[in-house]
Amino acid sequence: MSGNLPNTDDVLLQVPDVRCLRSAAETDHPPRILLLYGSNRECSYSRLLTLEAERLLRYFGAETRVFHPTGLPLPDDAPVTHPKVVELQELVEWSEGQVWCSPERHGAMTGVFKSQVDWIPLNSGAIRPTQGKTLALMQVCGGSQSFNAVNQMRILGRWLRMLTIPNQSSVPKAFLEFDDGGRMKPSAYYDRVVDVMEELMKFTLLTRGNSDYLVDRYSERKESAEELSRRVNLQNL
């Protein structure tokens, strides 16, 4: 046992070690960022805000993909082999970080957005496709500024075991913040979007090569060791 920690296993209880962390320079490809938005409207301000975020991320050096939710079936209303479901899940696995953007409707994120998250599995075989990946949150409001949608999405990010960055963006009266060409106008709200994407890139560069180590847990190492022991014992019967 570890000193005065009689309930722990010496072999499995590891002291965190900075030498186990990889340098950002050791990863030889641009950060891979997936962007999701929560509206199928032809004039979708969450989509326009997402595209502004994508432009910033590309400027910062990221490789980006935007998933367009039109045609995605409701959860459990189609098999996981549906082409849009396959597309979404493959993009989730490809990504090292994500941006989520939803309108706030009736005080909550939209069903369009939640349906996308509900198609993301917590486990895919032995892989947790979102665990340890970074996440940035944004929302658009039709009226005064609110944070209900981003707060709800923050909870979802925690359930998916993602590293949600501290900063976030909420754009009130979004219909006033974009020009006729669909570009966001200069404002403090735009500056906040810049801040959020800059922060997402920094967190992704810091963590993407280290996510497996950062989320390696004592309880899961212990469980894995016990499962291995059981398998060996069964083979010896």
Curated annotation (Swiss-Prot):
Enzyme Commission number(s) from the entry: 1.-.-.-
Entry's Gene Ontology BP terms: protein homotetramerization
Chain sites annotated for binding FMN: S39, N40, R41, E42, C43, S44, Y45, S46, S102, P103, E104, R105, H106, G107
Function field: Has NADPH-dependent FMN reductase activity and high NADPH-dependent ferric reductase activity with highest activity for Fe(3+) as substrate. No activity with NADH, iron trichloride, Cu(2+) or Ag(+). May be involved in cytosolic ferric iron assimilation as an NADPH-dependent ferric reductase in vivo.
UniProtKB keywords: Flavoprotein, FMN, NADP, Nucleotide-binding, Oxidoreductase
Annotated Pfam families: FMN_red (PF03358)
Superkingdom: Bacteria
Name by which UniProt lists this protein: NADPH-dependent FMN reductase ArsH
NCBIfam families: resist_ArsH
InterPro entries in UniProt: Arsenate-R_ArsH, Flavoprotein-like_sf, FMN_Rdtase-like_dom
GO molecular function: ferric-chelate reductase (NADPH) activity; ferric-chelate reductase activity; FMN binding; FMN reductase (NADPH) activity; oxidoreductase activity, acting on NAD(P)H, quinone or similar compound as acceptor
Disulfide bonds listed in the record: none
Temperature-related behavior of activity: Optimum temperature is 35 degrees Celsius for the ferric reductase activity.
Quaternary assembly: Homotetramer.
Effect noted on mutating E104 to D/Q: Strongly reduced ferric reductase activity. Binds FMN cofactor
pH dependence: Optimum pH is 6.5 for the ferric reductase activity.
Family (UniProt): Belongs to the ArsH family.
Co-factor requirement: FMN
